Design a protein with these regions (language model features):
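Cofactor-binding active-site loop characterized by glycine-rich and histidine/acidic residues
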Residues: 1-126
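Active-site pocket-lining segment
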Residues: 131-144, 156-163
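Glycine/aspartate-rich loop-and-adjacent alpha/beta segment that forms the canonical ThDP
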Residues: 174-228
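Generic beta-sheet signal
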Residues: 24-26, 100-104, 131, 190-198
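Conserved thiamine diphosphate
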Residues: 97-100, 147-180
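Short secondary-structure boundary/capping segments
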Residues: 44, 148-151, 208-214
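A short alpha/beta connector and helix-capping loop motif
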Residues: 113-138, 193-195
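Short acidic, glycine/serine/threonine-rich loops at helix termini
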Residues: 38-40, 115-117, 143-147, 179, ...
Length: 228
């Protein structure tokens, strides 16, 4: 839902094109969500059908995004690197006097990585108000509940203490997403983060949390293709 909103309503990249230096830039720090991005790019005619239908197959789309494919702005690797990348791209745009915003989606499990907090400090110090982070707060990481691995605590207070403007919304509700982006668009001189409370697998009955949590507490659909 968040990626659909960004490409269809929020960003200028579809209008300007991926080679235009004035474009808004989006990428996900948690690259395992690439199929969702591929679906949006396919719907926009950016990824061809023959490639879209070969996810994780030889000659097809990779399980994590790769810049060899049109429309992919950044690769993903070790978790926790996305905000740092976003900081650098935002700084480069300012240095080159180019317009355009930078949007980064992160996972909640990623915030067990310390690099995120280094990036939060740096972005606030530089008042990078064109950097917008969306935290996909679905409370599941890889195959377990986040709070069973490391409880993240009060995220709003943590982000605010680093100097970020923080908003929270239902990340599966387009009207809530619209209101939140409208609000943060007015904020100047501070980077922004949206804590988007989402339900993993929303809308697909057998994938939707908590239906897909097995008896051993493992979430089944972190990767792989549906079997229903």
């Amino acid at each position: 839902d968040i990626v659909v909103w960004l490409y269809y309503r929020e960003m200028n990249v579809v209008k300007l094109g991926f080679s235009n230096p004035h474009r808004d830039i989006y990428f996900s720090s948690k690259g395992h969500d690439a199929p969702g991005l591929y679906a949006v790019l396919f719907s926009l005619g950016i990824i061809p059908e023959e490639l879209f239908l070969k996810l994780r197959r030889l000659g097809g789309l990779h399980g994590h995004p790769d810049v060899i494919n049109h429309g992919i702005e950044a690769k993903s690797g070790s978790l926790g690197m996305g905000i740092s990348k976003g900081r650098c791209i935002t700084w480069a745009k300012k240095y080159l006097r180019l317009p355009g915003r930078v949007f980064v989606v992160t996972g909640d499990g990623e915030f067990q990585e310390g690099q995120n907090f280094e990036a939060l400090q740096g972005a606030a110090h530089l008042s990078q108000d064109r950097l917008m982070v969306i935290l996909d707060h679905n409370k599941i990481q890889s195959d377990k509940l986040v709070n069973e691995i490391i409880d993240l605590g009060d995220l709003e207070t943590k982000f605010s203490s680093f100097g970020w403007h923080v908003e929270r919304c239902d990340g599966n509700d387009f009207q809530a997403i619209e209101r939140t982006f409208t609000k943060i668009g007015r904020i100047k001189h501070r980077p922004k983060i949206i804590i988007a409370d989402t339900i993993k697998g929303k809308g697909v009955s057998f994938m939707e949390h908590p239906n897909a949590i097995k008896e051993n507490g493992i979430y089944k659909w972190h990767d792989g293709a549906p079997d229903d």
